[in-house]
Amino acid sequence: MTDKLPLALFLMGPTASGKTELAIRLRQRYPVEIISVDSALIYKDMNIGTAKPDERELSLAPHRLIDILDPSESYSAADFRRDALQAMDDIVAEGKIPLLVGGTMLYYKALLEGLSPLPAANPEIRQQIEQEALTKGWSVLHDELKEIDPVSAARIHPNDPQRLSRALEVFRISGKTLTELTQTKGDSLPYRVKQFAIAPKDRAELHRRIELRFDKMMEAGFEEEMKALYARKDLHPDLPSIRCVGYRQMWEYLDGDCTRDEAVFRGICATRQLAKRQITWLRSWNDLTWLDSDNIEQALETMSEAIASD
């Protein structure tokens, strides 16, 4: 049955690992169309700090699901799954192969496994929880979560109000715990997927790449890009767009919480932490072929062979 399903390619990897270069090279060789799997690239006017493909790169290889939202908007894994499935269907209808490229592992997971039937956010209940936090403190609410959902409470730190609030909200809306609901899987992906991950073999090399890229972003005008966002006055640090690595730290600088140099240092450190989390995800991933960032030609041949042999 799976042999009759259309082929899709996943090209995953930590930030600054060379995914975009490899994807563009692959598109020049095969009838693939790129879908971005990146929770930062979805935002308009956030080009430099996200290392978004530039005009030349996009002319060589258009990317779907970039520049689709204003930074004031939110976008969930469910939104991504819906949009990615539509894009994949469109690509297959054109007789081409979907190539999904990026490092937002939660999006890949949602696409592969489907989504748990979690209730939509309820502003009234969320506001009620925030009010309780103001009067009682988040530690008391964390104790409440321990009583109803000890598994989630063990994973969520008392100083993580966003995740703590969501866990309580889910229970109050549905009467079921976050743990119960997340163990219920949705629809699996109706494609034959070949999965690849690219990264340098040496972690120090990845750190060097991250620092170099951040420095280049600053030279390219990241501070000016951030100032334009800051000046809008309708954005704030709790938005997913401003929580993106680099943007959060530059916002702190513009808010007067740190110096420019401190913001750059914090941004580099945060990007390294992101890369570490991405690699941790990938090491636990099944059916994955690893590629070496330091040998793009070999990586290209490996992916080419996978397509040609299909």
Swiss-Prot record:
The keyword ATP-binding applies. One of its GO terms (biological process) is tRNA modification. It comes from the Bacteria. InterPro entries: Dimethylallyltransferase (IPR039657), IPT (IPR018022), P-loop_NTPase (IPR027417). The record marks T104, R126 as: Interaction with substrate tRNA. It catalyses: adenosine(37) in tRNA + dimethylallyl diphosphate = N(6)-dimethylallyladenosine(37) in tRNA + diphosphate. The keyword Nucleotide-binding applies. ATP binds at G13, P14, T15, A16, S17, G18, K19, T20. GO terms for molecular function: ATP binding; tRNA dimethylallyltransferase activity. Keywords: ATP-binding, Magnesium, Nucleotide-binding, Transferase, tRNA processing. Its EC number is 2.5.1.75. Its cofactor is Mg(2+). PANTHER family: TRNA DIMETHYLALLYLTRANSFERASE (PTHR11088:SF60). Catalyzes the transfer of a dimethylallyl group onto the adenine at position 37 in tRNAs that read codons beginning with uridine, leading to the formation of N6-(dimethylallyl)adenosine (i(6)A). NCBIfam families: miaA. Belongs to the IPP transferase family. Monomer. This is tRNA dimethylallyltransferase. The lineage of its organism: Bacteria, Pseudomonadati, Pseudomonadota, Gammaproteobacteria, Vibrionales.
